[in-house]
Amino acid sequence: ANLFTSDQDLYTDSR
């Protein structure tokens, strides 16, 4: 996830 994305995206990108 990018710094501009929401925190929700951080978890989805942690795959």
Curated annotation (Swiss-Prot):
It is an enzyme of class 1 (oxidoreductase). Its cofactor is Ca(2+); heme b. It catalyses: 2 a phenolic donor + H2O2 = 2 a phenolic radical donor + 2 H2O. One of its GO terms (molecular function) is metal ion binding. Coiled coil: none annotated. Its EC number is 1.11.1.7. GO terms for biological process: hydrogen peroxide catabolic process. Signal peptide: none annotated. Binds 2 calcium ions per subunit. Binds 1 heme b (iron(II)-protoporphyrin IX) group per subunit. Belongs to the peroxidase family. Classical plant (class III) peroxidase subfamily. Removal of H(2)O(2), oxidation of toxic reductants, biosynthesis and degradation of lignin, suberization, auxin catabolism, response to environmental stresses such as wounding, pathogen attack and oxidative stress. These functions might be dependent on each isozyme/isoform in each plant tissue. This is Peroxidase 4. It comes from Daucus carota.
